[in-house]
């Protein structure tokens, strides 16, 4: 009877202690679960090969990923090089086209300028004979009466206006007398000996030449010196009276010998 009571009291005391420390029971339970799991993993022979297989698969995936990244990097670099080459090609083509267009523009401008100059030269060449006639009239005419002088002054005024217009257009007369003959500027019409001028020096201007903005508008017609002429050799002429006297003396001597 007493033994039963003591045993029941012992059980009650254990139950009370367990109820008074619920935290201890709750903390100790996870550790106990982890230890149990470790024991179960260590005891299970299939777990270790599975872990090894997972690590191998991970390594294979990493290596394949690195290979793919290397392949993508090489493709990107090749594509970049190709784009750089295409850029250089297009840039060179653009520079060539730009240079060709610039040359075309300059050539067109030069051709237009040349055409303008040709038209101007053609027009002025038709006007120059009128200027020549005015100059001849000024040199040859010598008006004496008052009316003639008034008429002379009037057309000389027209001549001055015409010369001024030509000057404004860039026309300038040549100065050729006493200059060395230049076939690019002069046209030799006559050649004659001259004791005063050296050879190939312009003696006289027969028709005035003109420049147009540095270009030859009309060549000058000139007379060119040939230099000093050949010297005349003055041979001594024997005295006719002396020869006659010698002839008479020889005749007299011959007659004396005969006698």
UniProtKB/Swiss-Prot annotation:
GO terms for biological process: protein folding. It comes from the Bacteria. Its main location: cytoplasm. Keywords: Chaperone, Cytoplasm, Stress response. Residues 56-73, 240-253 have a biased composition (Polar residues). It is found in: Cytoplasm. Residues 1-74, 228-259 are annotated as: Disordered. One of its GO terms (molecular function) is adenyl-nucleotide exchange factor activity. Residues 17-40 have a biased composition (Low complexity). Belongs to the GrpE family. This is Protein GrpE. The lineage of its organism: Bacteria, Bacillati, Cyanobacteriota, Cyanophyceae, Synechococcales.
């Amino acid at each position: 009877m007493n033994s039963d009571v003591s045993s029941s009291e012992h059980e009650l005391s254990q139950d009370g202690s367990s109820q008074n420390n619920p935290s201890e029971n709750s903390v100790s339970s996870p550790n106990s679960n982890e230890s149990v799991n470790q024991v179960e993993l260590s005891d299970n022979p299939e777990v270790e090969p599975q872990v090894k297989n997972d690590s191998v698969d991970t390594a294979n995936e990493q290596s394949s990923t690195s290979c793919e990244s290397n392949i993508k990097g090489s493709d990107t670099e090749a594509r970049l090089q190709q784009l750089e080459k295409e850029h250089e090609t297009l840039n060179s083509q653009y520079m060539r086209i730009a240079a060709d267009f610039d040359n075309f523009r300059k050539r067109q401008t030069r051709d237009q300028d040349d055409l303008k100059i040709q038209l101007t030269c053609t027009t002025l060449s038709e006007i120059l004979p009128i200027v020549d006639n005015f100059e001849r009239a000024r040199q040859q005419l010598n008006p004496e009466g008052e009316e003639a002088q008034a008429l002379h002054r009037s057309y000389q005024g027209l001549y001055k206006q015409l010369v001024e217009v030509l000057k404004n257009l860039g026309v300038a007369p040549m100065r050729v007398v006493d200059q060395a003959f230049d076939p690019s500027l002069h046209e030799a019409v006559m050649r004659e000996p001259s004791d005063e001028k050296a050879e190939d020096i312009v003696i006289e201007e027969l028709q005035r030449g003109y420049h147009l903005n540095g270009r030859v508008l009309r060549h000058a017609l000139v007379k060119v010196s040939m230099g000093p002429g050949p010297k005349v050799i003055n041979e001594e002429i024997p005295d006719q009276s002396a020869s006659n006297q010698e002839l008479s003396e020889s005749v007299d001597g011959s007659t004396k010998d005969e006698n």
